[in-house]
Amino acid sequence: MKSSSRLLLLLSVILAVIILDAFPFIQKEWASFVPSKAATRSTRSGISAVSSPLPSVTTSAMPNTITVSGQQWGKSTCFIGATEGSSRFDIADLEDLGINTYHIYGGMSRWEAQDDSSVYGYPTISQIKANPNAINWKQWDTVMTNPTGGSDYSWEPTPRWQGNARTLFSELNAAHIRIVLTLRNRDDQHNPSWSPDPPRTTTDWNEWWEHVFATIYWLDVRNHYNVTDFEIHNEPDTPGQGWIPEATEGQYDMFAQYTDDAISYVFHTYLPGRSYHVYAPATSNSTWPKDMLHNIPQYFDSMDIHVYGDFRFGVEEVHTWMNQTAYAKEPLWVTEWGSYKHQYDSESFGISLINDLIYGSSPGNDYVFGSNIFSLYDFSTNATGLINYKGGRRVDYYAMRLGIRALQGCRPTYQSITGNKDLLSITTTDAQKNVYLLVSNQSSKSPYTIHVNLSALLSRASGIMWQFDSAHKDTIVGNPTLTNGMTSLSIPASGAVLVKFLHSA
């Protein structure tokens, strides 16, 4: 072999060694330019909002852009409402806010402050089943129609709304607002004193069973107020909410058994075929929901919790417990949330409320079927309400109204992705195929101009834009247009915007 040929062979061998040694680096660098299959996979569609938990979606986005998926993500919260407050009631407020559920604290202190029978423990359960007229309906009619002091809230300090239970229930029913009714033997002021806390003897249980039966029979059989959702007590594990000391789980289990039995008897006997729902355990930051799923699942069909703070922390934990049982597809309600600490005059707190509504309308372990913010009105002069005792609407009333407009009523949802940690967004459509884009900004200092890509849902459309911030209380601020599916929006600090893009046939 010639020397030149030997030299060429040697150089070829050396070059091959260099290439093989560098191959892992070349492969790594090439991968940075070519997206993997996982990175190009589209997001999931058609996920049931009360389905099992979803795997996390890893999708990148530019910080000041929002990209909306064209595939349905889930459905929004079906029922968004409020708890009552004793100082006021005006159906026009509920309709303006856009709520479709109202949480009422019923029970003995409200409608049986004195035993309706002259003999404790009578009529018995068997006597009532034999003849419901064994109950003193004259006293029930009086309490529900002509309450003490002219107010169905006679059990609360003044000022009180002046009106009776008939008016309250009839107006809610006429407005098609779903009533969630708490059934409790004692209230948060530990009344009535004649009712044991908790019931223990046969006569105690006769009294409680009769009260539950009489409440529902009066509302739905003697009258037709369509009350079909019942909460078993209110925070029974909290000393300030009735029982002293707080109930044990065993005591609550027995209480739930008698409560459910009375509810079921009314519906099966007098309202056959009518759907009804029983909620439990109405606790906050507790392991009771997990235990109830194992101990008394036969006595309730709707998981019921209270969450004060970020929705995700309480809701995700309870969904995990539900997924481990046969309860995975049953509804989860948050029948109290928001604040009882006088925080509804803060724009930043209003943004946290909007964010919770968005979380609750997200699929998987964050999903909330129904919710009732605490509270719509003040209790007496205690500033817990979105509306004060004089009728003035606090700042966060308007945050709630904006969020409800976007999310109320089991609407199809579409994932709306942004890379900006201050922004949270979701998109929904209504029955008329109008598209709603809701964006919140939790930064107290930084406003943002964002670019929105809605091309997967719409190409061209005109819109109406509402804004909530320190200068705007859910007011219309513009009419953005969509061109080739694109638009730009300005999001104020500690603010939110909602854009409704109108569907054109």
Language-model-detected regions and their locations in the chain:
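Mature N-terminal, pre-catalytic/accessory segment of carbohydrate-active enzymes
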Residues: K2-R88
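Alpha-helical scaffolding within the catalytic cores
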Residues: P63-V68, S87-D90, Q162-T167, V212-A214, ...
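Substrate-binding cleft and catalytic face of glycoside hydrolase catalytic domains
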Residues: L97-F300, D304-F313
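Catalytic-core region of carbohydrate-active enzymes that cleave or remodel glycosidic bonds
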Residues: S302, H306-T381, N388-A406, Q442-S444, ...
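Carbohydrate-binding surface patches
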Residues: N420-S459, V497-L498
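Solvent-exposed beta-hairpin/edge-strand motifs
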Residues: S455-D474
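C-terminal beta-strand-rich structural cap/linker in extracellular carbohydrate-active enzymes
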Residues: P480-A505
